[in-house]
């Protein structure tokens, strides 16, 4: 075992790969943790922070023991960049959080309101004044996973509608679609549970 650790293959290939993948793991966790903090998930963020630092210590300790190995430096930096990208991709797949959509229209507001209401979304309409006259402001609060559907409805009803999308840190009450939970932070753990259960099903077949 000692011979393998001291070999050139370990120092110039295996060790950098271990550092690379360790860095991917800890930066991915860190990226998701920061997103959870911005979403107000105060219970999930500390748990992720614990594992993030634990993996980081393991990676940096190997760097400090091999300061003359420049390949480890590249592996460390490449793992950081890759981990950031992977973390963003995972966060997009999880679609955690609540959004406020504000739509400003000067016509067809009744059709848009009706389409959104029939689709199960809560809608609030406010009269307002625009540069060129009277307009309607339509507000709806949705889950991030529903964004593409709502945008599609808006563009189908009024392709020239002006709309903006903002993050909602906290929402109290409101009308949400049936089956939508406000505690969507647990989807982070349910994602891995689903993959694990699907793997067990394949083994039992």
UniProtKB/Swiss-Prot annotation:
A GO CC annotation given for this chain: plasma membrane
**Name of a matching Pfam family:** DUF5698
Q: What compartments host this protein? A: Cell membrane
Family, per the entry?
A: Belongs to the UPF0316 family.
Q: Which residues form a coiled coil?
A: none
Task: Please give the superkingdom of this protein's source.
Answer: Bacteria
Gene3D superfamilies from the UniProt entry: 3.30.70.120
Name of this chain's protein: UPF0316 protein Cthe_2213
- HAMAP family annotated for this entry? UPF0316 (MF_01515)
This protein's record includes keyword Amino-acid biosynthesis: no
Bilayer topology annotation: Multi-pass membrane protein
Q: Supply the alphabetized keyword list.
A: Cell membrane, Membrane, Transmembrane, Transmembrane helix
Record organism: Acetivibrio thermocellus (strain ATCC 27405 / DSM 1237 / JCM 9322 / NBRC 103400 / NCIMB 10682 / NRRL B-4536 / VPI 7372) (Clostridium thermocellum)
């Amino acid at each position: 075992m000692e011979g393998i650790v001291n070999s050139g293959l370990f120092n110039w290939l295996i060790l950098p790969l271990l550092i690379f993948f360790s860095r991917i793991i800890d930066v991915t966790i860190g990226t998701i943790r920061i997103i959870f903090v911005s979403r107000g998930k105060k219970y999930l963020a500390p748990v992720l922070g614990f594992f993030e630092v634990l993996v980081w210590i393991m990676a940096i300790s190997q760097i400090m023991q091999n300061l003359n190995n420049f390949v480890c430096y590249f592996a460390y930096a490449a793992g950081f960049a890759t981990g950031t990208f992977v973390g963003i991709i995972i966060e997009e797949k999880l679609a955690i959080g609540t959004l406020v959509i504000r739509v400003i229209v000067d016509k067809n507001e009744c059709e848009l309101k009706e389409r959104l209401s029939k689709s199960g979304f809560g809608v609030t309409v406010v009269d307002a004044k625009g540069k060129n006259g009277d307009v309607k402001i339509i507000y709806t609060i949705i889950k991030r996973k529903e964004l593409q559907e709502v945008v599609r409805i808006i563009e189908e009803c009024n392709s020239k509608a002006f709309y903006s999308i903002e993050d909602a840190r906290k929402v109290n009450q409101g009308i949400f679609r049936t089956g939508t939970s406000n505690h969507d932070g647990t989807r982070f753990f349910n994602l891995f549970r689903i993959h694990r259960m699907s793997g067990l099903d394949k083994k039992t077949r």
